[in-house]
Amino acid sequence: MKNAFRIGNVLCILLVLGVFVGCGDDDPVAVNPPTVDVNEAGSIGIYSDTDGRYSRLTDTGGSVTFHIVHKVTDGATASAFRIEEPAGWVRISATSEFAVSIGNLDDGISIGYGECRSGSIHVMSLTYRSPGNTVPGSTFKVLPHNEWPENVQVVNCGDQ
């Protein structure tokens, strides 16, 4: 992606998620995401809601839907990334909110937003079968696309 703004640190888009079973406790535990240094490119994370407000994800031992949300103030027209899930989680489906997407979540997917968008951009919905016994502290990760391994790619609205 020529002229793409890059999110400089994988940690700025990694959200620690509460994906675990509490030992005999049915009350899921929330884990707050780390402080994020949001730059012009914004941040991309995995949330339990389409607005990117709730990062609590729980292992219920069944089908669970999560959402990839790109939070950006100055606007973006596209992004490229890949997803790494904890051991035992099986992806059932991945649906982009936009018509143009190339690639896959394992090696890397590039998604065009169709126009300049800002705020909380709901990029994708992911449905997984959770194992019911995820190790505490396990995380889902948003990582760089394999074609551009140095950073997650974001096309700023000014780069159209």
Model region roles, listed by residue range:
Residues 1-11:
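Bacterial N-terminal signal peptides that target proteins for export
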Residues 19-22:
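C-terminal motif of bacterial Sec signal peptides marking the signal peptidase cleavage site
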Residues 25-160:
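Acidic, low-complexity intrinsically disordered segments
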